Amino acid sequence: AGALALALWGKVDVQVFLNGFHTPFQDTFWVSVTAMGGTVFCLCVLLAGSIFSYRYMVSGIVSILCTMALVALLKHAFDAPRPLTVLTQAGVWDSIVLVEGHPLRDTLSFPSGHTAAAFSLFTTLALFATRAWVKTLLFLAALAVAYSRIYLMQHFLSDVLAGSFLATVISIAVYLWARKARWIDFGRPLVSLRRYGRPENPE
């Protein structure tokens, strides 16, 4: 749907349209949500998860590091301008509603790093999760971070689509590798997953 919207209306018109839904509550809410896309936050979640499974932790950390390395390379390769620059040049910046106190950047827009980190984290967790409702919540959390980057005028829809795609592909690849890497099980976690009805080392 996002790719279709970009094809039909272009990233500037899509950005201006989505900017029309600002409210004071959402300003505060999306600033909080976007923090879940920070690399430090994601790594802390995975380190905390190691009390349940080292496999989760290693898979997630490898996924995030690989994803963010590729994102950094692409950011500097494309050096794409952010909404601040593009919308100013398009003559529509004066009509844009901004979140007060949230600083804006003007370069290295493509792809979105926060979106990539969030999708890397939540995709990894979803792949290991066994319950459908948990997978759904994790997917919605990743989508929320992606939307927050657009809401806060940090990225275009194309940026978050690229970040989410790269992270998802890398996370799936790392997950498939981690399921077969026996050396990852280098110790017993603090909390046994058997208490929660599933094996600690899935095959």
Regions found by a protein language model. Name each.
Residues 3-7, 45-52, 125-128, 147-151:
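Hydrophobic alpha-helical transmembrane segments
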Residues 15, 50, 71-79, 126, ...:
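Membrane-water interface at transmembrane helix exits
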Residues 28, 53, 57, 61, ...:
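Hydrophobic, aromatic-rich alpha-helical transmembrane segments
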Residues 3-5, 9, 66-73, 141-153:
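Aromatic-anchored segments of alpha-helical transmembrane domains
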Residues 93-203:
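Membrane-embedded catalytic cores of phosphoryl/pyrophosphoryl-handling enzymes
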Residues 1-44, 75-104, 202:
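N-terminal transmembrane-helix/juxtamembrane module of multi-pass inner/ER membrane proteins
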Residues 45-73:
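Interfacial segments of alpha-helical transmembrane regions
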Residues 25-26, 53-57, 130-136:
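Membrane-helix interface segments
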